[in-house]
Structures are given as C-alpha cells and as structure tokens.
Amino acid sequence: MSYMVARMQKMKAGNLGGAFKHNERVFETHSNKDINPSRSHLNYELTDRDRSVSYEKQIKDYVNENKVSNRAIRKDAVLCDEWIITSDKDFFEKLDEEQTRTFFETAKNYFAENYGESNIAYASVHLDESTPHMHMGVVPFENGKLSSKAMFDREELKHIQEDLPRYMSDHGFELERGKLNSEAKHKTVAEFKRAMADMELKEELLEKYHAPPFVDERTGELNNDTEAFWHEKEFADMFEVQSPIRETTNQEKMDWLRKQYQEELKKLESSKKPLEDDLSHLEELLDKKTKEYIKIDSEASERASELSKAEGYINTLENHSKSLEAKIECLESDNLQLEKQKATKLEAKALNESELRELKPKKNFLGKEHYELSPEQFEGLKAEVYRSRTLLHHKDIELEQAKRQVSLRASKNYFTASLERAKEKAKGESIDRLKSEIKRLKNENSILRQQNDKMLGKLRELMPDKAFKNLLSELKAIKPIVNIIKKAIEKSLF
C-alpha cells in the first residue's frame, strides 16, 4: 500500500516570494531539473485566489483586515505554513486525471474543515514534475491572531499524520500513515525530494527485487519475517529497550542485491562450460547440416539441368515428329494424285488396246498371221510400250513408298506413345525423389531449430545481456544457410 505524505514548512515574508514564483512558474528558466516545461500548462490552482497577486501581499492583506490588534505584523513572523501533499508514483499511476484532482481537493478539504476555509491562501497542484503534488499554503490565523506555534504544535502535527490518512481512506483513497512530520518539518525542498526518492527506491527494492526488509543485529542475518519484527518491537517497547530486529537501510538492501547478482554471476560462470560445449556441438551439427544442404542443392541443380536437357530433347523429337507427320500427309496427297493419274493412264491404255483390236492380222506367204503397221503406228506403239513400262516402274516405286509410309506412321505412333511414357516416368521419379528429400531436410531443420531455440532460451536466462547480444550477432552469420535451403527447394519444385 502507498504512503500518505504531508510535509510542512514555515514560510516567512522572505520565503514567500520564491514560493510564489516557483508555484506559479513565473521563471523563464528553472534551476529545478525535475520540471518539464512542456507539461506546465497542466498545473492548476484549487482556490479562487487572484493568481496575479503575490502570496506575501495576499496574506498580509488578509491578516491586516481580520486581526484584532493594531500592531503591525512582525518582519520575522511566519505568514504561512506551506504543506506539500503527495504520495508515491505507483499510487498516481493508478489514478486518472479526474481522480488525481479529487485526491488533492479531498486533502485541501481536510485542512479547510480543521483549520478554516478562509485560511487556505493557495493550493497549487503541479503535474509537470516527476510525481504529482500540491503546495498548499495555510495561514496560521485563529481568533484574530497570527501564530504558527499555536496552530501547528508538535502534538497537532502528530495528529495530522494519524488523522489525514484515515480521512483520505474514508473518502476512497487507501493510504498508509507516513513518517512523523515533526522529524522532517525543517527539511528543504531538495531534502524532501531526496527523501521521496529514497522512499521510492525502498519500495522498488522490496517489491521488484524482493530485498529483505529486516535485519537481526544479533546475528547480522537479513530476513523477511514481519511477524518476528513486530513481536520483537512490541517486546522492546514494553521494556523501553531497543529492538534487536530493525528495518534494513536502502544501502543494506542494495548490498544484498549486489551479493545476489554476484552469486548469479558465479552460477553463470559454472554453467558456462556446459553451455559452450552444447554450443560447440550445435555448431558442428550446423556445419554438418550446411554441407548436407549444399550437397542437396548441388544434386537439385544437376537434376534440374537434366530435366531441362530432357525437355529440350523431347521438344526436338516432338518437332521432328510434327515434321514427319507433315511429310506423311504430303505423301498421302501425292499418292492420291498418282492413283488418279494411274486411272487416267489405264483409260488411255484401254483406248489404245481398242485401236489395236481394230487391226486385222494378215497372212504371209507361209500362211502365218502378222500385223502390218505403218511407220507412224509402230512408233506410236513403241512410245506406248515405253510409257507403260515407265508408268509401271513409277507405280512400283510409289507402292514401295506407300508401304514405307504405313510403316513410318506406325513407328511414329509407337515412338510418340513411348516418348510420353518416358517423359511422365522421368518427371515423376525425379520430382518425387526430390520432394521426399526436401521433406526429410525440412523435418531435420525443424528439429535443429527447436534445439537451437531451446539453447538460446537457456543462454538468455543465464548470460548477461551484452554477452547474449554478441552471441546472437555471431549466430546471424548462419543465415546464408537458409538462403541455400530456399534455393534448393525452389529449384527442386520448379
């Protein structure tokens, strides 16, 4: 749970000028490095005071108008008690803008109800520093008299430290009681901020790093035993002696944390050798796989080249087949033309034979029959016989060509069918084998990657960030292997 912080500082006339300039941000440049000028417009005032009037003039006018004495205000009089109201960063991170404003208004109302609404001179809320806080000026004016000692004595300050957190809790803000203001009331603003920083450091060491909150001075042992602490404290308070168990200082917590880190570093050193061995084994395995990938890539390239050559040869044969097909069609056309010519010749021959039948045989003196031909008829007969022989010779040639064409067509059909079967078989076997090999390599690569991720996880837990980043940089050199695998897969599939 967060603490309620309420710290008071007495303000005389000489202090109010600087307080006014600081709270209203009238400086062009700030010596306070905590101020973020880009957020100063988010600051606001919870009273209806005229913000152009200085605190000193406002408070003196108020006192002079309401005092019962005619005496002038002493030059060294405490004109105002400024309260800084805040909590830790974690508390405000859980609140939105409206809830933050309600928190400060509630704190202001507590002082207004207990010390007079008219005595609240200013209530300036700052949101432009590391932690939201309120500077609230309470004029210690009561019964017509100005007296800081009368309004805020030691007992009243203790009462506020007890009562204010309770009041805030009743209004929905769960806060623990802070340190007694009487111990810190004379602190400067810088000292107060250092105290706040120490408080935040303490909470971070306890909550984030789990530093031990208590130390037993009898043994020097650090522990987390809250029950033992309060038991010893109650016993010591009863007999008015100092408890042997006290809260650890921030320095003791940091020393403990440093020791924990040193022990962790020793563990890292002891586990470094096995990790280096594992890493060496992984590097050997990666080297082996790299060689396998290169080999597969080479084989895939060879297979791709063979497939390319086979496809080129197949394309050549297909072109040759198309050429043969065209020749066969041409020969068939020529054969048809020859058949027509043959029929014409047969008709012509039939006519010539008819003429020959008209020739009548004659008998010679021996009584034998013979044909007498005129020179023209003889020459015509010779020519006809020559043409017939020539035609028969051509027909014999054409018949042989036709027989060869029939055989060629059958061979072409057989070759085409065989070629298609060979093509499918070659492609199927090569692609199936390559796919199988690629699948095997993918599985091995997946297993290797899982082992690698597991090892990197262990290294991340055990190694310092810088050493781990250096290791990652070295492992990035293995990335070209991935490119080799991708190329092998692409060449195998396409």
Curated annotation (Swiss-Prot):
Record keywords: DNA-binding, Plasmid
Cystine pairs: none
Biological process terms in GO annotation: DNA recombination
Top-level taxon of the source organism: Bacteria
Coiled coil: none
Keyword check for DNA-binding: yes
Pfam families, sorted: Mob_Pre (PF01076)
Gene3D superfamilies with a match to the protein in the record: 3.30.930.30
Binding site for DNA: 44, 115
An example molecular function term from Gene Ontology annotations: DNA binding
Note: Contains conserved positively charged amino acids probably involved in the binding of the pre protein to the RSA site.
Function: The interaction of the RSA site and the PRE protein may not only serves a function in plasmid maintenance, but may also contributes to the distribution of small antibiotic resistance plasmids among Gram-positive bacteria.
Family: Belongs to the plasmid mobilization pre family.
Name of the molecule in the record: Plasmid recombination enzyme
Naturally occurring in which organism (per UniProt): Streptococcus agalactiae
